[in-house]
Amino acid sequence: MMENYKHTTVLLDEAVNGLNIRPDGIYIDGTFGRGGHSRLILSQLGEEGRLLAIDRDPQAIAVAKTIDDPRFSIIHGPFSALGEYVAERDLIGKIDGILLDLGVSSPQLDDAERGFSFMRDGPLDMRMDPTRGQSAAEWLQTAEEADIAWVLKTYGEEHFAKRIARAIVERNREQPMTRTKELAEVVAAATPVKDKFKHPATRTFQAVRIWVNSELEEIEQALKSSLNVLAPGGRLSIISFHSLEDRIVKRFMRENSRGPQVPAGLPMTEEQLKKLGGRQLRALGKLMPGEDEVAENPRARSSVLRIAERTNA
């Protein structure tokens, strides 16, 4: 059941300003959430402007459907498929900006029934779209110990990944876990050294959530597609919340902001260099939340906004 959650959109003005909105432009909000970014974009569009929003969370879709605006449309699906959505609408190369607000949203974290948080007991689910795929409980009950350890180490950067994975498998053999509180307790008991500033289950919950939702693969595919769908001068405005996300975004923007990499001393004609293509993006820098925003919304502390512009190449 969906409740009315107060949701403060992180880096709201900065992310939308990064799109450099044109009144008649066509924009994509790849992570609609509760619509903070979408509503601000719509307020800056003229009658000819268009906004295509995407979200895989059915609760977000329900909120989006309350927006009665002919310039706005919502798609229920993963943002990794934005290339397909754009192609279906014959808009390849015509998109003036894409905004992505990565990771889990505050309403998802705060709703115990979604199973994202170790702070609230609820079903051990963690799916951004509960209608598709395996829940966290289902995966943890069927996965091999080595696979669980790999996920915890890779996506949670968990120092005690092997110990925690062993404890999870042993607990599931005795009695399958179905609640977030059960997983949090198992992880805490298996963690020999506690961080006084961080709950011992923090990294495990992050890792399992990322795995269950294929979050990093989603980001990589969306970024790859963005090069095809953006018009020259179109902007990418992307907010990430942890180092794994930001690393992918930073690397993508850096690699595509370079010209062709040719070994030193390799003789090439101007025609050959032209065929290699020029840089496809121009990185415009990064922004982080100010002290006032962090004080008002502590979850903003780790956020990073990166902006880039599509070139004519």
From Swiss-Prot:
GO terms for cellular component: cytoplasm. The keyword Cell inner membrane does not apply. Pfam families: Methyltransf_5. S-adenosyl-L-methionine binds at G35, G36, H37, D55, F79, D101, Q108. One of its GO terms (molecular function) is rRNA (cytosine-N4-)-methyltransferase activity. It is an enzyme of class 2 (transferase). It catalyses: cytidine(1402) in 16S rRNA + S-adenosyl-L-methionine = N(4)-methylcytidine(1402) in 16S rRNA + S-adenosyl-L-homocysteine + H(+). It is found in: Cytoplasm. Its EC number is 2.1.1.199. Belongs to the methyltransferase superfamily. RsmH family. This is Ribosomal RNA small subunit methyltransferase H. It comes from Shigella flexneri serotype 5b (strain 8401).
